[in-house]
Design a protein with these regions (language model features):
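A catalytic-pocket lid/entrance helix-loop region that shapes and gates access to the active site
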Residues: 53-96, 170-234, 268, 281-297, ...
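Alpha/beta-hydrolase fold active-site neighborhood
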Residues: 70-82, 87-94, 100, 231-375, ...
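Short beta-strand/loop motif that positions the catalytic acidic residue
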Residues: 372-373, 378-381, 385
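Conserved alpha/beta-hydrolase "acid-adjacent" motif
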Residues: 386-391
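Catalytic active-site module of serine/aspartate enzymes centered on a nucleophile-bearing elbow/loop
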Residues: 409-446
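N-terminal cap/lid subdomain of alpha/beta-hydrolase-fold enzymes
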Residues: 1-107, 383, 395
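Conserved acidic catalytic loop of the alpha/beta-hydrolase fold
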Residues: 127, 141-155
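Glycine-rich nucleophile elbow surrounding the catalytic serine of serine-hydrolase chemistry
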Residues: 16, 141-142, 160-172
């Protein structure tokens, strides 16, 4: 039976659904391709829609210092993936100073200035003028309903991953009677603030690092010694020392900084045990042979379109949330998150400062989404998800009047395409409408 169109959003915000489906539809959605036309779309501001344009592709200076997504519930380098989490590559020493020890108040004016400069550059290069004020998620949801109508589908069948769950949940809230079979995998919790979203993702990464270190130490060839805490500290020590004196790499003029190592570690943690081996090799080379060549290879995978992806994420996210707090609040948060997430927490507290400086801000307060009257919505959460913590999936499934939670026991960001048993349950729902039973747990094959 042909069911019409299945619309896909791979996350971001800022990732191209068009490029993602071109690259991944054959493999990622093999189980449903016989029944659906798989449609990727670029939301407003993204890719082949009228894009937010900030600079020539080779001009990295226009990247906001850390982007709102640093780290962020984001598109994973997983089987369900078109791209990588791009914008944890802070270019600026000021920002890395904030991450490593300079007081928040001392670093704040310079960070704010970077965001202001980035906004000015994006505003100057983006046509039509004023687009930066109209790329919020609710506007994208209205566009998506027009796409649904144009495609001839009475109902929207949809699979959203990571940020795509936020887009999908808002669609179901605004257009419940148009909502068909909807899968939200790697869920964001729409009821929490931007800072809570950032802090949750940061703590998730910190937990994922400890899980990885334990896995590494239980296997062969792990360069990290002691227990998981000691091993995590060795990763932080490597980052700090490479920021002092960058590691030589296979490219003579491009030594690898600690900031880049942190980005590469984070990128690797979006994967799972299938891909963690390359992180172990990279750490071993850096710690025991004082070379960053393998880390350089990982960072190369993450830099595609870094300028515009970071800026688009910035623009969309800042419009989705009001600025929350002031310098005193942000400074206190900075101390708290550095304590809770010492490896990745350095940038987290700047999100509201960055959005305030960016200047295009939201007015809608975060609130639970109920989607009253919508068809059943399948929410999928992975217990070891580093970017969208499992409790967010539980929370979203509880908020939705017709939500059903499927739990994947496993690591890595998002479940679909990662674990065959989970993928099959999702495919069955999309093809037949049959939901997994309440409380259903699926596991990775070992």
């Amino acid at each position: 039976i042909h069911r019409g169109s299945l619309f896909i959003n791979p996350g971001g915000p800022g990732e191209s659904g068009v490029q993602y489906v071109e690259a991944a539809a054959e493999t990622s959605f093999a189980g449903v391709q016989g029944s659906y036309d798989i449609i990727g779309f670029d939301p407003r501001g993204v890719g082949s829609s009228t894009p937010i344009t900030c600079a020539a592709a080779n001009d990295a200076a226009a990247t906001p210092a850390a982007g709102v997504g640093a780290p962020q519930a984001d598109t994973p380098p997983s089987p369900v993936d078109g791209g990588a989490n791009n914008d944890y590559k802070e270019k600026s020493p000021e920002v890395d100073a904030a991450a490593s020890g300079t007081s928040f108040e001392d670093a704040a004016p310079r960070i704010a200035d970077e965001y202001k400069q980035a906004e000015a550059q994006c505003a100057a290069n983006t046509k039509p003028a004023g687009l930066l004020d109209h790329v919020d998620t609710v506007s994208a949801v209205r566009d998506l309903d027009i796409l649904r109508a144009l495609s001839g589908n009475e109902k929207l069948d949809y699979a959203g991953f990571s940020y795509g769950t936020y887009l999908g949940a808002h669609y179901a809230e605004l257009f419940p009677s148009n909502t068909g079979r909807m899968v939200l995998d790697g869920a964001l919790d729409p009821s929490i603030s931007l800072y809570e979203r950032q802090a949750g993702a940061t703590k998730g990464l910190e937990r994922a690092l400890q899980t990885y270190v334990g896995w590494c130490q239980a296997g062969q060839g792990c360069p990290l010694t002691g227990g998981t805490e000691a091993g995590s500290q060795q990763v932080r020590d490597l980052i700090a020392s490479a920021n002092q004196s960058p590691l030589p790499s296979s490219e003579p003029n491009r030594p690898v900084t600690g900031t880049e190592i942190r980005a590469a570690v984070m990128y690797s943690l979006y994967g799972d045990e299938q891909t963690w081996g390359s992180l172990t090799s990279s750490l071993d080379e850096a710690i025991n042979r004082h070379s960053g060549s393998l880390f350089r290879q990982i960072t190369e995978q993450t830099v595609a379109d870094v300028v515009n992806t970071a800026a688009v994420r910035q623009a969309i996210t800042c419009l989705d949330y009001p600025v929350d707090g002031d310098m005193a609040v942000w400074s206190a948060r900075h101390q708290e998150i550095k304590h809770d997430a010492p490896t990745f927490g350095g940038m987290t507290a700047i999100v509201d400062l960055g959005c305030q400086a960016w200047g295009h801000n939201g007015t809608r307060e975060p609130a639970p989404i109920h989607a009253k009257g919508a068809a059943p919505i399948l929410v999928v959460g992975s217990t070891g998800d580093p970017a969208t913590p499992y409790e967010w999936a539980r929370s979203l499934a509880d908020q939705l009047d017709t939500g059903r939670l499927l739990t994947r026991e496993g690591n890595g960001h998002v479940a679909y395409g990662r674990a065959a048993a989970c993928t099959q349950l999702v495919d069955t729902y999309l093809l037949t409408g049959e939901l997994p039973s309440p409380g259903r747990v699926c596991r990775d094959e070992t």
